[in-house]
């Protein structure tokens, strides 16, 4: 059931099937996400992430530094479109903001490893939410991409549902004002 909710939730803006063999290389869809502060103050969900090869990260261990948490999937067109923008954002804010990209792909490592191998995303981590704990924590049917900014104490500042221009001045101003 949860998988069906996730598959249906992606703000794909495309007539493509929800889970094609690989993300299409067509023109990028327009960014539709907007900053939503209505969840401000909520505590970061408790979840353990896994990296290819088996390393783990407890989200609780990220406290002490602001975190931009991005839930994405290889089959989600806006997710794939914003990955290079998030990669540059991670480089630009290195040391001041942790950018955590977390795959919600049901096939986990099987999809995530080739995705990263085919792209130059050296500044982004390859975390996976294998049990979909984060998807459940954000309501079970959360649309992808979902990006949430947390302050150093692990409290939500704002979130964006849908594709977003992470290279734009609005994004940078919203991040800078929260750091």
Task: Give residue ranges: language-model regions.
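Alpha/beta-hydrolase fold active-site loops
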Residues: 66-67, 97, 145, 155
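Thiol/disulfide oxidoreductase modules built on the thioredoxin-like
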Residues: 116-123, 128-178
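N-terminal targeting signals for export/organelle localization
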Residues: 1-46, 179
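Structural microenvironment flanking redox-active thiols in thiol-disulfide oxidoreductases
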Residues: 81-120, 130-137
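Short active-site neighborhood of thiol/selenol oxidoreductases, capturing the structured segment around
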Residues: 58-80
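Hydrophobic beta-strand positions
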Residues: 48-49, 149
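Active-site acidic short loop of glycosyltransferases
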Residues: 63-65, 95, 121-123
């Amino acid at each position: 059931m949860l998988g069906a909710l996730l598959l249906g939730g992606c703000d794909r803006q495309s007539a493509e099937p929800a889970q094609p063999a690989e993300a299409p290389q067509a023109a990028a869809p327009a960014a539709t996400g907007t900053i939503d502060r209505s969840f401000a103050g909520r505590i970061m969900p408790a979840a353990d992430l896994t990296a290819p090869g088996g390393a783990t990260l407890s989200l609780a261990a990220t406290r002490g530094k602001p975190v931009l948490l991005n839930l994405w999937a290889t089959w989600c067109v806006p997710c794939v479109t914003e990955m290079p923008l998030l990669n540059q954002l991670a480089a630009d804010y290195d040391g001041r903001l942790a950018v955590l990209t977390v795959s919600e792909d049901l096939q986990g490592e099987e999809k995530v490893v080739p995705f990263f191998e085919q792209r130059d995303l050296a500044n982004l981590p390859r975390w996976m939410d294998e049990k979909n704990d984060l998807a459940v924590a954000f309501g079970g049917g959360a649309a992808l991409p979902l990006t949430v900014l947390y302050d150093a104490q692990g409290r939500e500042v704002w979130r964006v549902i849908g594709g977003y221009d992470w290279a734009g001045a609005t994004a940078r101003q919203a991040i800078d004002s929260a750091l």
